[in-house]
Amino acid sequence: NATANAFMTLLTHREAWEAICENPALIPNAVEECLRVAGSIIAWRRIATADTTVGGVAIPKGGKLLIVQASANFDARHFENPQEVDLYRDNSVEHLTFGYGAHQCMGKNIGRMEMRVFLEEFTRRLPHIRLVEGQSFDFLLNTSFRGPAELWVEWDPRRNPERANPAILDKPLSFKIGAPVKDDITRAVVVRERHEEGEGLVRLVLADPRGRPLPAWSAGSHVDLVAGGFRRKYSLCGIRDDRSVLEVVILREADGRGGSRHFCDAVAAGDTIHLAGPKNLFRLDESAPRHVLIAGGIGITPILAMADRLKA
């Protein structure tokens, strides 16, 4: 079920499928993202062993519960843009499809590896595979497990890559056991613009190299910039609704450890660097009746984005 769900998800989101065909190193995190958005284990039934209260709801002893953990995989408080399939999401592995704590799936790493091998084999040998158009999907009649009863695909054997290069049959990619390494999950971006905004302040405007939309972000979000052996976190600013670019402003610290100096002095317009995120550790509660925003020093950047959001 998990593998069928993954193929259905990736072939439905064609850009994601093409991304792992071009860069198979994305496959491990693609597996985690598919388990998040279309996991094969969606709910468990439980019986309360004692009177309790959860989220303000009283649950009596003996009460029968249907715990739909798949809903947590779309919690916007934890996952940025939860409805989107994002192969570069750096916390995809925090899905609950394998459960959590003492009762999590003992075979999760075997399952991960099986899914990776399936995807690697198909992307290497049948990158042109497509879902048959017009089909409808019937799912298992089950409250706990979810997967399509059947998945119809099609391809043209004349386009199989091994016809032009038989050597690819002997070049499967190997994967490490376990969850993907978080720090390896970065996307390439090009520095579209570089601006001197003041003494020691540099604004970078970042875009996808192929002009594809970048992830949406919420007020208070940051990204990790990776270049020149440095990895630094910078708050996002600029126009949130413009998904063609992401913007950061960097303060050059002359006496720092070298990260800000590198991004301010060595990075130029036209350069390609890497980025992780966005991620929000300072989420704005827009339901509050009023807000008082206080910041000093580096904290002013996310606060400005929050002020812009509240003003809008």
What is the predicted role of each segment?
Residues 46, 59, 77-81, 199-201, ...:
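Short glycine/proline-enriched turns and hinge-like loops at secondary-structure junctions
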Residues 1-173:
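Cytochrome P450
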Residues 19-20, 249, 312:
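Short internal beta-strands
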Residues 173-272, 289:
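Ferredoxin-reductase
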Residues 261-312:
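FNR/FR-type flavoprotein reductase catalytic core
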Residues 70, 228, 278-279:
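Short, surface-exposed secondary-structure boundary micro-motifs
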Residues 78-88, 237-246, 285-298:
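Short, compositionally biased
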